[in-house]
Amino acid sequence: TCGYCKWEYFTEVLEYVDLVLYDLKHLDSAEHKRLTGVDNQLILENAAKVVKKVKEMIIRVPLIPSLNDSKDNIMMLVDFVSTLEKVKEIDLLPYHQLGVSKYNQIGQTYKLNEINPPSKEKINDIKRYIENRGFLVKVGG
């Protein structure tokens, strides 16, 4: 989940799940709003509530070069996740261009044509930083 919903919706399903995969895209609220159309306040509030109700929560981070892979964002993200006691794992989901042809097939414009996937070096740098902060890190979905 991206976590952007009323808390009541979470409470309806959390009693049935042990594991939640929770996406965090950007920790700066204004930048999150620019990228997604909504700020991240509700998302962060829900993350803090969800983690108290489940056995395990894994944070998933789509890594999109020049949009959310900055050192500042990664540092803020790890600082926030460090407050979520049950989170031990962060999954990095590097941007790829595998869906470009699908956009063409349905007559839609692909808006990220100018963005290339992150380099292995960049991914490994981010992975090492997060591991050094005490988290298990997996790359890919």
Q: Model segments located where?
A:
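A cross-taxonomic marker for long C-terminal extensions/tails that follow the last structured domain
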Residues: 121-141
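Short glycine/proline- and charge-enriched loop/turn segments
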Residues: 104-113
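Conserved AdoMet/S-adenosylmethionine-binding subsite of the radical SAM
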Residues: 1-98, 104
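Short, flexible active-site recognition loops that position polar ligands and cofactors
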Residues: 112-122
